Design a protein with these regions (language model features):
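Conserved class I S-adenosyl-L-methionine
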Residues: 2-52, 157
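Class I SAM-dependent methyltransferase SAM/SAH-binding core
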Residues: 58, 64-107
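A short acidic, Gly/Pro-enriched loop at the edge of an enzyme's catalytic core
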Residues: 106-118
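A short glycine-rich, Lys/Arg-flanked "PGG" loop and its adjoining helix->strand segment in the class I
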Residues: 133-145
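Conserved beta-strand signature within the Rossmann-like core of class I S-adenosyl-L-methionine
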Residues: 146-153
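Short, glycine-/aromatic-enriched active-site segment of Class I SAM-dependent methyltransferases
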Residues: 154-171
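Short alpha-helix
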Residues: 172-187
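Conserved S-adenosyl-L-methionine
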Residues: 189-200
Length: 215
């Protein structure tokens, strides 16, 4: 008799498929991101208004390091973390001064209260929702009291593995507004902003959230 598979097995497989997709497409991803005119996303700009000028920041799912480099150039102390080796290698070659760490987002290797702010642009959406909920609670422990978290996730009803597009094979968890709000609050955050927006560059509707750790 074959051993029973737990729900964790299937969610892990979705994460691994997404990582593999980025490993295969890393060069294309970095080239595409680097060609874009780098305009600071409005959510990022808003998040930074709440943070001190010398804040210690973690870029969660940093990919090739473009956002981390933007923050580093503006004087923040930045660490980027991602699971995809090829993206990190490209980032280290392009941005030699950056601290880029390879780690699974579901098991981050940082000490409690190590950061003032956490930035997660289009990264939590690649985790199945049970994993994302656990990560939200873990992230709350990584920031100091009063620390800020900002994230973008895909909006909608259906989560699915996308087999087409410019990086085929990625999993996308789509969230409803009230569903994400509940998950963020239950993880210990106080929501400052949570809005559904249309992103013309990435196409489609997204949820932007900024939240603060109490205490």
């Amino acid at each position: 008799m074959a051993p029973l598979r737990s729900p964790h097995d299937s969610t892990t497989q979705l994460v691994l498929q997404t990582i593999d997709a980025y490993e295969r497409s890393a060069k294309e991803c970095v080239a595409r991101w680097s060609k874009r005119r780098h305009r600071r996303p409005p959510l990022l700009a808003e998040w930074l208004t709440h943070l001190p000028a010398d804040a210690s920041l973690l870029d969660i799912g940093c990919g090739g390091g473009k956002d981390a480099d933007d923050l580093d150039r503006r004087g923040y102390r930045v660490v980027g973390v991602d699971r995809t080796s090829a993206l990190l290698l490209a980032g280290r070659r392009r941005y030699r001064s950056l601290s880029l760490v390879r780690a699974d987002l579901r098991s981050l290797p940082f000490q409690a209260m190590a950061f003032d702010g956490l930035w997660a642009a289009a990264s939590l959406m690649h985790l199945p929702k049970p994993d994302a909920r656990r990560l939200l609670a873990d992230l709350c422990k990584l920031v100091r009291p009063g620390g800020l978290f900002a994230a973008t996730v895909t909006y909608g009803m259906k989560s699915r593995l996308v087999t087409d597009g410019w990086v085929p094979g990625r999993y996308f968890a789509r969230w409803k507004k009230d569903e994400l709000a509940r998950a963020v609050r239950r993880a210990g955050w106080t929501i400052l902003e949570l809005n559904v927006v249309t992103n013309r560059e990435r196409k489609g509707r997204w949820i932007n959230v900024i939240a603060r750790r109490g205490g």
